[in-house]
């Protein structure tokens, strides 16, 4: 079992399979042909307001952050004068090989490997497969060299980020009701200090696209695309399965008391009422539609179960990936011990002393506390499901790892940015964006110079 691996060894087989699928589609539906339909669809896509906003914001902010990281490396340098690991002597090529990116690149090039059952030994089994599998495919198509994999990873996360921003724009446009608010939501999320990870070879971009894509299609009762995005979320990161909880709350929210359901901004809504007006028709439940909804809500959990099945085949333990997190400093302690520890430090040492001793932890906690503090306002304006999305994605990791990566986790809390876009007056938004952008510059400097912001 320990030598089993899943690998793509020949990209030409993938391209041949794509050609077969294309030919089959042409035989099944000859008109319009792909050559006729594709340019029209591309023009429609590129002319959409969501696409323009996502491209404009996504590309400009990611390129700017990479430039900040590059010049931080050249001017500030690394701790101890050298990086902990180096993939290439060229700092531009080496720029994206930071922290977890090295593990994703290892999986993409060598596959999953399992040597020991010792939970204190770091192994790549803890990293979920969606990003490294896509990285392997694209990297091999681009030539299979290290720069090719670096370029593939950067391109993948850029594309995923743009898709996530486009979905955020569409969701904000439908739920908040104005293009100005949609633009604000996109810009606020992209400028957020911990949005630095959207340009790194990390899973944040893919998770953002999957989570918002699932939510967008789910509330419109477009079950198939919602389920597809949901499975992707489950295959992207360990907490992907938690998306099933707010999706389930979206389904039951019409039956909840008004005080509990909260706002209805992100609730179920179909702009085409003749298609499916509700899960309730004529006073009775549409059981077929309800079944589709519950099955779709389970899709993120299905994605995690698929990876559990794979790890069971590889290691004999379906949750080996969960046990392996202990080697990264994640073991369940509970929220109260975490709160008590930090509270004791603050009361005995003071904020200044604590900040000077653990500045990165304090920075991470600032991000976590920011989004958690907005849970109640999000609930009151956007709904219980939106608030639950924040809680189930923030509290369990904090209970298991404290401040570790808490800021990074806060970056994908998209309901927070929808709330900010709806609550912050238009005249004040530039100030929020400017403050966020300065913070992201700091985070980029720390991350790309190998300070412990991961």
List where the protein language model places each region.
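Short hydrophobic/aromatic helix or loop-helix immediately within or flanking a transmembrane segment
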Residues: 98-144, 337-346, 397
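Transmembrane-helix signature of polytopic, membrane-embedded enzymes
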Residues: 147-151, 168-191, 209, 225, ...
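Transmembrane-helix motifs of polytopic, lipid-linked glycan transferases
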Residues: 135-137, 152-175, 370-374
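Membrane-interface alpha helices of multi-pass inner-membrane proteins
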Residues: 190, 194, 211-216, 224-251, ...
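Membrane-lumen/periplasm interface segments of specific transmembrane helices
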Residues: 61-82, 96, 125, 232-233, ...
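Start-transfer (signal-anchor) and selected internal transmembrane alpha helices
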Residues: 19-84, 288-299, 432
